[in-house]
Regions:
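N-terminal interaction/assembly modules
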Residues: 1-132, 136-163
Length: 163
């Protein structure tokens, strides 16, 4: 499983948290099992392989961190979504942006460019081209404004390598 696939699985879980009353830990306990992956994997190839320990740890950190910092991340989205009310933003796009912003803010081992590029690639799978451009614009503005070093921070070559 690649880091990008693990990120996408985390985004699915973050998206799901927006519809229920479950905590991040409750959702992770229910979803992060080999049995659940096998069940989902019958219809969704992304889940065909259960994550190894490192990948599972990454997914758990993303889901827990994004969930616990949700209000802060939503404030960033609202700040950079000029002309858009937060309620108008598609839920999947919001989950994607929250995840990328969490990685930029709280996961220093993930290059900013890798978090943003992967988020845009994932958005292309689920959203219209207009929403993908919106996601790219929000994340780009966020990083350029909040983190001046964005231009100098390289993308890891191994971002899509098997881990």
């Amino acid at each position: 499983m690649t880091r990008s696939n693990a990120r996408e699985i985390a985004i699915h879980m973050i998206f799901e948290l927006g519809f229920g009353n479950s905590s991040a830990d409750e959702l992770l306990n229910n979803e992060m099992t080999p049995e659940r992956f096998a069940q989902i994997g019958e219809e969704e190839p992304l889940y065909a392989q259960f994550p190894n320990e490192k990948q599972a740890q990454y997914i758990r950190e993303l889901v827990r961190g994004t969930f616990s910092h949700g209000p802060e991340l939503d404030d960033y989205i609202a700040r950079y979504a000029v002309g858009w009310s937060f309620e108008r933003i598609p839920r999947m796009a919001a989950a994607i942006m929250r995840t990328a912003m969490y990685e930029v803010l709280y996961m220093p081992d993930i290059p900013n460019a890798a978090a943003i590029n992967s988020a845009v690639d994932i958005a292309k799978k689920y959203e219209t081209p207009e929403v993908v451009s919106f996601v790219n614009g929000i994340l780009g503005s966020f990083v350029r404004t909040e983190f001046q070093e964005f231009q100098d921070k390289p993308v890891k070559e191994a971002e899509n390598a098997e881990e």
